[in-house]
Amino acid sequence: VADHMADELTSRRYKTALVVTGGGSVRRNGELDAVLKALEAAGVRVVEFSGIEPNPRVTSVDRAAALCRAEGVDLVVAVGGGLTMDASKAICAAAGHDGPAWELVLDNSLVKDALPLMTVNTIAATGSEYDNSAVISNIETNEKLPLASDLLWPVVSFIDPAYTITVPARQTVAGYCDIMSHYLEQYFVKDISPVAEGLIEGILRTVIRNTPVVLENPADLNARSELLWASTLGCNGIDNTHFEAMAEHIEKHWFAPLEAFPVPFSRKDVVEVLKRSL
């Protein structure tokens, strides 16, 4: 990742990067250090913003956007999982907006400009490294809503299976549940196209086949590579059926009262589906 990132940074001539992280695992496990060294090697000044919540809050987005403006940031680098990447997309949009970030969430058409985003993915899960959308929470209004814009596609995403080896088993499984949730909500629609159906079935088989392998041997890079492929394709539209999908995965956005608790997306989905089934 470091070598490829240094090449990208040099060719694009960025000057100041906001590096966004979550709870600290990327610092403990060494991924952040590699990114910081790549930025330093390319002559890019670094401003760090850490502590993104498990369900990113608009208050954090506003603070980070203000920091971008104050420091003259011209690049945002997300290091972590989907929630860090979601927050970073919102930060990219909010940095160029004359007003609170929540205005953009309520009306996505207000996104007129955005900072470029690079992502360094550390878990196979949401596929946020390869789409143009985010989900942001507002504790004050008790809402959790999507933000999407063509200006929010990452300019480049670095996806290295070695960066996922240190993910705990519990979080690993939660990520794979999230992957399957994305695909199943698209699979169970009326009149799904045969091409999309076949693609989704193949990806689901890949997740089912490789998950036990990774849990048995976390250092199996081949299995982790396959799971990262499955994650990356989940939300980028390649399997878009052009029909309304199931609501189970989307319903998690409505559980705003749960936002005070750091519960991963997929575990909420599983609980809700089980409740409906019993």
Language-model segments: which ranges?
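Short, acidic Gly/Pro/Ser/Thr-rich loop/turn segments
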Residues: D3, V26-R27, A124-G127, T164-T166, ...
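C-terminal charged capping/lid subdomain of soluble metabolic enzymes
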Residues: L233, G237-L278
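Predominant activation on well-ordered alpha-helical scaffold segments within soluble catalytic domains
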Residues: A6, D33-L36, V47, D62-A65, ...
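Active-site nucleophile and cofactor-binding loops and adjacent substrate-binding regions
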Residues: I52-E53, V79-G81, T241
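ATP/NTP phosphate-donor binding region
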Residues: V1-L75
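Glycine/threonine-rich beta-strand-loop-alpha-helix active-site module
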Residues: T59-A162
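Carboxylate- and glycine-rich phosphate/diphosphate-binding segment that chelates Mg2+/Mn2+
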Residues: S133-N236
